[in-house]
Amino acid sequence: NEGLDSFVFGTGRLLDDLIQYVYSGENCRLILMGDVAQLPPVMQTESPALNPEILRGYNLQVQEITLTQVVRQSENSGILFNATRLRDALRNETVEIFPKLKLKGFTDFRKVNGDELIEEISSAYSRDGIEETMIISRSNKRATLYNNGIRNRILYREEELSSGDRLMIAKNNYFWTADNKEMDFIANGEIIQVLRVRRTYELYGFRFADVSVRFQDYDLEMDVKILLDTLQTDAPALPKELNDKLFYTILEDYDDVPTKAGKMKKMKADPHYNVLQVKFAY
């Protein structure tokens, strides 16, 4: 419920704002859907929006329904078997001892040694394609290591950013789609592909690139500005202290603007402040 960014919408308490907005209307109802086994918001141990007791604290009448029947996986799936074992451990609060994964007896779940990993990923790319292959890691730091390893040892890309690179949007952005009727905004988690790197440069103590990209889910091309610094950070996006630095450094360009409102209007129209934050998406 607490906003962690320096500059947030509303009060910075998302659940409070959502409930206040919905129930300010007449005869409104709110349905919250989610998975209690997924990660909660950053720096929290549970998801407030999925906790009936927290919701009742807003003086709401709460009904809770849990779906348990799996319908889109094979009953013999090793992925489903082990995921269910983890889910049961979470529900029974026995996660202090991590459940041992069952490896044998499945065709879709197996152990790969470290010295086989590069070859396995390369084979998956050749067999199924990069877009159909996803590597999941336990931390942002390891994700950065995997991304760099894949680019260097499988795709043989030595440049900081190359045509063909797959990127994931790391923060919602409303600036670059303002004049586009097909997209309202660029969402966190959106996958894009670099078509052309027109130029890279340094400004305000940060590194930027002007690129042409294709949006995988929209078959749409767009010219955008991206922040190269986020590609190698061990955080999901630009850390707060660097966000603050970028904001206040750019703000100095508008010292001649007399009012705070005028300064903020300039900032909202500044392409460097509204730069796309991205991570490699391998």
Predicted regions and their residues:
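Short, charge-rich amphipathic segments
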Residues: 15, 56, 254-257
